[in-house]
């Protein structure tokens, strides 16, 4: 999170605009621009746990909010919003409706993002609340500015959706992976569970909680720990467990950062993007750290795009792997913890 992304470089072209402003920065914040921006004050809202950790170290705990929604304290005294447009338009609508409902009329609003992310959609989206005009174009990004003329009404409940998988209800929110239905990769992974599983399961990068919910529904012997870095995913997973009458611990964390102890199985459909960029770091951390969180005989079972270079890494870490099932796009990998490394302990929260 050290180098600035192109959108931040565009913001810094307008540094003088912010020198006497009280700024809130939100949206898809991926770097330390909030710490480098010269302003009267800077506060941040992020929906990503790992970015929250980095920004809190740079700005202080009180300057950074992490969560599904921003609260009124964030907007207090603010006269400027800088919003980083995410790649997901419904998530942008959710976040901007929330943020603009908290900010005072007359607040300056800047929206910045890569052209390929669809940042042009900001103009029609905000037309009724904050008419925007494009004020800069550089680094394949657009920067838009407007003034808040009407506060939107924000109702988080109105953004919830759900879908059904046989007798399992999946709850979901804007920005959560596979919001509109079960993705093909997760479907392939679930197809490998052809008999009830018993034991402690860690669902890393849990998203909607679909993997855990399907695995645990009707299987009384499953104990669940779910973790994700994305606040909407955490909310969706908690809601999915609740609506299906399932118990489980849902933790905000970056891969294994929130959990300790050992499990009988780790399951995941790991992401390979960070914003608009390809990034295999999370999946590599998942694989490299798995032995520290598996009991002897425990397994890592993940689904991944077939072209991703995971077989060699699995062999290097586990000394084994097999492909349980594959189709044209995806493979489900299984690797078994066969070598005793330290005394096993049940999963627990740090």
From Swiss-Prot:
State its location(s): Cytoplasm
- InterPro entries per the record? DNA_methylase_N6_adenine_CS (IPR002052), Mtase_sm_N (IPR013675), rRNA_ssu_MeTfrase_C (IPR023543), RsmC/RlmG (IPR046977), SAM-dependent_MTases_sf (IPR029063), Small_mtfrase_dom (IPR007848)
EC annotation?
A: 2.1.1.172
Alphabetized, the UniProt keywords read: Cytoplasm, Methyltransferase, rRNA processing, S-adenosyl-L-methionine, Transferase
Q: Which GO terms describe its cellular component?
A: cytoplasm
Task: Recall the GO molecular function terms of this protein's record.
Answer: 16S rRNA (guanine(1207)-N(2))-methyltransferase activity; nucleic acid binding
Q: What class of enzyme is it?
A: transferase
Domain of life of the organism encoding this protein: Bacteria
What's the chief localization of this chain?
cytoplasm
Transmembrane segments in this chain: where? none
Q: Which reaction does it catalyse?
A: guanosine(1207) in 16S rRNA + S-adenosyl-L-methionine = N(2)-methylguanosine(1207) in 16S rRNA + S-adenosyl-L-homocysteine + H(+)
Answer whether the UniProt record assigns the keyword Transferase to this protein. yes
Subunit-level organization: Monomer.
Q: Which family does it belong to?
A: Belongs to the methyltransferase superfamily. RsmC family.
Cross-referenced PANTHER family, in alphabetical order?
A: RIBOSOMAL RNA SMALL SUBUNIT METHYLTRANSFERASE C (PTHR47816:SF4)
Supply the name of the protein.
Answer: Ribosomal RNA small subunit methyltransferase C
Organism of derivation = Sodalis glossinidius (strain morsitans)
Q: Which gene carries the instructions for this protein?
A: rsmC
């Amino acid at each position: 999170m050290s180098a600035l992304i192109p959108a931040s470089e565009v913001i810094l072209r307008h540094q003088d605009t912010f020198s006497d402003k009280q700024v809130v920065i939100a949206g898809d914040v991926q770097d330390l621009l909030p710490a480098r921006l010269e302003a009267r004050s800077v506060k941040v809202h992020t929906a990503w746990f790992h970015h929250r950790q980095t920004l809190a170290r740079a700005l202080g705990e009180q300057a950074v909010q992490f969560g599904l929604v921003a609260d009124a304290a964030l907007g207090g005294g603010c006269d400027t919003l800088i919003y980083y447009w995410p790649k997901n338009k419904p998530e942008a609508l959710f976040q901007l409706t929330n943020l603009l409902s908290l900010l005072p009329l007359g607040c300056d609003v800047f929206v910045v993002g890569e052209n390929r992310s669809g940042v042009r959609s900001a103009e029609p989206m905000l037309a009724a609340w904050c008419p925007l005009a494009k004020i800069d174009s550089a680094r394949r990004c657009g920067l838009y500015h407007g003034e808040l003329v009407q506060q939107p009404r924000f109702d988080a409940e109105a953004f919830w959706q759900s879908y059904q998988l046989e007798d399992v209800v999946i709850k979901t929110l804007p920005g959560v992976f596979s919001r509109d239905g079960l993705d093909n990769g997760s479907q392939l992974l679930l197809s490998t569970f052809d008999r009830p599983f018993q034991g402690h399961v860690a669902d890393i990068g849990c998203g909607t909680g679909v993997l855990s919910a399907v695995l645990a529904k009707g299987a009384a012997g499953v104990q669940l720990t779910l973790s994700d870095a994305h606040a909407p995913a955490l909310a969706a997973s908690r809601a999915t467990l609740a609506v299906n009458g399932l118990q489980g611990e849902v933790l905000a964390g970056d891969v294994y950062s929130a959990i300790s102890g050992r499990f009988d199985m780790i399951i995941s459909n790991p992401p390979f993007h960070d914003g608009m960029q390809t990034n295999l770091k999370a999946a590599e951390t998942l694989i490299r750290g798995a032995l520290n969180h598996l009991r002897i005989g425990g397994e890592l079972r993940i689904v991944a795009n077939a072209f991703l270079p995971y077989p060699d890494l699995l062999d290097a870490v586990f000394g084994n792997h097999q492909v349980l099932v594959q189709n044209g796009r995806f493979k489900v990998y299984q690797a078994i913890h066969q070598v005793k490394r330290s005394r096993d302990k049940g999963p627990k929260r740090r």
